[in-house]
Amino acid sequence: MEPFRIHKGTAAVLMNDNIDTDQIIPKQYLKRIERTGFGKFLFDEWRYDNERHENPNFPLNAPDRKGASILITGDNFGCGSSREHAPWALADYGFRVIIAGGFADIFYMNCMKNGMLPIVMDKDMRENLTKTDAREQIEVDLENEVITTSTHRFHFTIEKMWKEKLLNGLDEISITMQYEQEIREYERKVAVY
């Protein structure tokens, strides 16, 4: 996993509350276990009409929001089923940071495990952040827990364990590999039957 320290990017705004994982990526696209290729299906039923033409009224389809890597959204983001495909779709689309009023617990952990930073921020702060010009680069500094725009600085908090994992680019496998020598020693000592 790539370490996450400072991210600079533009933001897309989708301030709906209770966006569930089926709205993030509908179930008909979950037939694969690779982590890539899901971005084109992100918010599929909102981004496209029945003939697969882009919906011009959907915020992510606005020309000045294309290429955004920060998503500012409502409360309870990622609720519903715990499909890991939802963070995969967000990451494959290009999002590195999701800022919401809150997240479903499993979705929150799945974001972290996939190298994305989910930030919990109150509504007033998010609304101030949405006023940032669509072309402005927003800086997200994980180490100092600060989001900076040209006019504001917003502080956020993150649990120390998750912060360290993201800063160091550690997933479960890389953490296990830190104990490779101890595992080998244990396996040598234990009898094989």
UniProtKB/Swiss-Prot annotation:
GO biological process: L-leucine biosynthetic process
InterPro entries assigned: 3-IsopropMal_deHydase_ssu, Aconitase/3IPM_dehydase_swvl, AconitaseA/IPMdHydase_ssu_swvl, IPMI_Swivel, LeuD
Keyword Hydrolase among record annotations: no
Lyase as UniProt keyword: yes
Swiss-Prot/TrEMBL keywords: Amino-acid biosynthesis, Branched-chain amino acid biosynthesis, Leucine biosynthesis, Lyase
EC number: 4.2.1.33
One GO CC term, this protein: 3-isopropylmalate dehydratase complex
Biological pathway: Amino-acid biosynthesis; L-leucine biosynthesis; L-leucine from 3-methyl-2-oxobutanoate: step 2/4
Catalytic activity: (2R,3S)-3-isopropylmalate = (2S)-2-isopropylmalate
Gene3D superfamilies on file: Aconitase, domain 4
Signal peptide: none
Pfam families associated with the record: Aconitase_C
GO terms, molecular function: 3-isopropylmalate dehydratase activity
Assembly and oligomerization: Heterodimer of LeuC and LeuD.
Family statement drawn from the similarity comment of this UniProt entry: Belongs to the LeuD family. LeuD type 1 subfamily.
Function: Catalyzes the isomerization between 2-isopropylmalate and 3-isopropylmalate, via the formation of 2-isopropylmaleate.
Name assigned to this protein: 3-isopropylmalate dehydratase small subunit
Organism expressing this protein natively: Bacillus cereus (strain ZK / E33L)
